[in-house]
């Protein structure tokens, strides 16, 4: 057992079972009743306000979910300048660790059993109006002996039925870039709902079956572009032993538009159970028409833009021209609520491909007394994106901005304080 320097009143610490960049997890038992527990703490001795909020968020959401498939949360203890989250310990290890410990990946039988259990869990979240937003192998625990599967880490989960992701630098986006749904990037002109978890589950399935992520890159912006616009190689191409219908199921989960994915976890579960039934009876899985039982019980209007193809095309053509070192300015006008913002937001997708920055400003009839209000709004947004870049990138921008502004720099700073 490794030496540990963590103590918490009322608990006997046994060993450390996880060490991440942000959190540490210890195995322990409660002294009062000898109950085995897992204790999660933040690695940072002086955590930021947002880290503390996320820690409380996962306790607040998970404490009321004493349900199969979701880790049970016992208490939130005060620990130094932070918190300690006390959860059940059912002898599980992360799915990531479970697959890494084996020379080969999970068998088809094991994969299907895990997939069916996770479908059940997503159905539970759906019925409780919870969006997890960070489904990945590291957040899925499995008991190596009983094969029981449980979902953990509700730190960025949401109780809202729908969210709008604001445009942010990829380095500070919520979630894990390799598993992020297109709408979670904030660059799809679409809101986030329960179907974002289906995409992340699809990436998880892909990794379990292929032994690799569908998109691999160390460049955050390139990863975003892949999630938004690129199709990964099909699982059947990577490994011919994977039945084509399983490849089809995973591809449907990973559809770019939410309305093209599965619309219910039970529809997904039915298909996986049928695959398992075939495998147990015949030793192989034949192709069949998937998603025949996939019916959502919520009325969801597709977030497509209708009747504005000409205007969107005009904007995209202008963007292609300015990508070749030209400068253009375009103004979009119209009455309130006519859809100006929706049209402008459509330009975000090609901007990611060209590694550009997307900023916008809106002239508001209630802010007519503020000169250049839309320009100020747009450039304050740009400064916010630049400030989350690396020090090296910031240095380049600092040099360029100082050269361009010269003696006028102080004047601009008074208008845009972030500068």
Task: Please tell me what each predicted stretch does.
Residues 146-189:
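Activation segment of protein kinases
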Residues 80-94:
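Conserved short submotifs of the Hanks-type protein kinase catalytic core
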Residues 176-281, 333:
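C-terminal lobe helix-coil module of Hanks-type protein kinase domains
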Residues 373-419:
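Conserved Walker-type P-loop NTP-binding/catalytic site
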Residues 76:
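Activation-segment/catalytic-loop signature of the eukaryotic protein kinase fold
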Residues 114-115:
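Activation segment signature within eukaryotic-like protein kinase domains
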Residues 46-64:
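AlphaC helix of the eukaryotic protein kinase fold
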Residues 120-130:
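Protein kinase catalytic-loop region centered on the HRD/HxD motif
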């Amino acid at each position: 057992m490794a030496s540990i320097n963590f103590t918490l009143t009322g608990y006997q610490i046994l060993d450390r079972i996880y060490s991440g960049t942000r959190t540490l997890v210890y195995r322990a038992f409660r002294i009062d009743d000898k109950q085995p527990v897992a204790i999660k703490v933040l690695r940072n001795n002086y955590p930021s306000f947002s880290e503390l909020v996320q820690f409380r968020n996962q306790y607040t959401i998970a404490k009321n979910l004493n349900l199969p498939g979701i880790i049970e949360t016992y208490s939130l203890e005060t620990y130094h300048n932070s918190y300690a989250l006390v959860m059940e310990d059912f002898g599980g290890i992360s799915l990531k660790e479970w697959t890494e410990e084996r020379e080969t990946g999970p068998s088809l039988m094991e994969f299907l059993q895990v997939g069916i259990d996770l479908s059940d869990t997503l159905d539970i979240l759906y019925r409780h109006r919870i969006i997890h937003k960070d489904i990945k192998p590291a957040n899925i625990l499995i008991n190596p002996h009983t094969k029981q599967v449980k979902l953990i880490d509700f730190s960025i989960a949401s109780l809202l039925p729908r969210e709008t992701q604001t445009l942010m630098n990829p380095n500070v986006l919520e979630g894990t870039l390799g598993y992020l749904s297109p709408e979670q990037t904030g660059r799809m002109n679409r809101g986030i709902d329960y179907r974002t978890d289906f995409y992340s589950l699809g990436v998880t399935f892909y990794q379990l079956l292929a032994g690799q992520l569908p998109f691999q890159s160390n460049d955050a912006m390139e990863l975003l572009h892949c999630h938004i616009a690129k199709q990964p190689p099909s699982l059947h191409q990577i490994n011919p032993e994977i039945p084509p219908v399983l490849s089809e199921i995973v591809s449907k989960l990973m559809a770019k538009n939410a309305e093209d994915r599965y619309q219910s976890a039970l529809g997904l579960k039915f298909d996986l159970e049928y695959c398992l039934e075939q495998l147990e009876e015949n030793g192989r899985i034949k192709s069949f028409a998937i998603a025949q039982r996939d019916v959502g019980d919520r009325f969801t209007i597709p977030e497509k833009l209708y009747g504005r193809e000409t205007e969107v095309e005009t904007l995209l053509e202008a963007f292609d021209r300015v990508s070749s070192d030209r400068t253009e300015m375009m103004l979009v006008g119209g009455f309130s609520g006519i859809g100006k913002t929706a049209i402008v937001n459509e330009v975000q997708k090609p901007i990611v491909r060209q590694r550009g920055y997307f900023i916008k400003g809106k002239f508001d009839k209630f802010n007519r007394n503020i000169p250049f209000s839309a320009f100020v709004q747009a450039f304050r947004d740009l400064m916010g994106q630049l400030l989350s870049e690396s020090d090296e990138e910031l240095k380049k921008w600092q040099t360029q901005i100082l050269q361009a502004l010269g003696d006028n720099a102080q004047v601009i700073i008074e208008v845009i304080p972030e500068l």
